[in-house]
């Protein structure tokens, strides 16, 4: 009986403190009955690399360390678009502008979840020739670091777009 109480006294608080949080469902907004499948090429506006770290630990010798992760959102977006058959271009050529999308990325919010927070990103696809929006998608992610949050949010937003 004492053993059961001991196990429950450890298990219940740990479940309460580390419970799963549900992420908001990704949101997709289409404009003028357009589809990104009508396009062949994409140009991603450059983004800066983001580095974040978590977890500091020590041992009996006083050695400390942590985990550092980095992400460049435009690389993650490009990889997903490559998997879906799109071709990345380094510049927009007037002859191909009608078949080219401009892809913009932005962090659009944070939400407190349990003992941490999640990050929401918004990805905008624009017609390169008319400068009109094709589709805008948003997704939310939560991971160990801010880099993980952004990576998961991008994946969730674009995963829904390509279903």
Task: Pin down the residues of each PLM region.
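Sec-dependent bacterial lipoprotein signal peptides
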Residues: 1-22
């Amino acid at each position: 009986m004492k053993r059961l109480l001991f196990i429950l006294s450890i298990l219940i608080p740990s479940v309460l403190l580390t419970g799963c949080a549900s992420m908001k469902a990704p949101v997709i907004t289409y404009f003028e009955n357009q589809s990104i499948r009508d396009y062949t090429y994409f140009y991603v506006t450059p983004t800066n690399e983001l580095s974040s770290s978590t977890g500091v630990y020590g041992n009996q010798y006083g050695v400390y360390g942590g985990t550092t992760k980095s992400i460049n959102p435009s690389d993650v977006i490009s990889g997903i678009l490559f998997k879906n058959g799109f071709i990345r271009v380094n510049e927009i050529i007037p002859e191909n502008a009608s078949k080219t999308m401009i892809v913009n990325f932005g962090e659009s919010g944070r939400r407190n979840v349990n003992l941490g927070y999640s990050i929401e990103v918004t990805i905008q696809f624009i017609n390169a020739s008319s400068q009109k929006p094709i589709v805008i998608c948003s997704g939310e992610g939560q991971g160990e670091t801010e880099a993980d949050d952004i990576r998961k949010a991008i994946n969730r937003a674009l995963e829904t777009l390509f279903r």
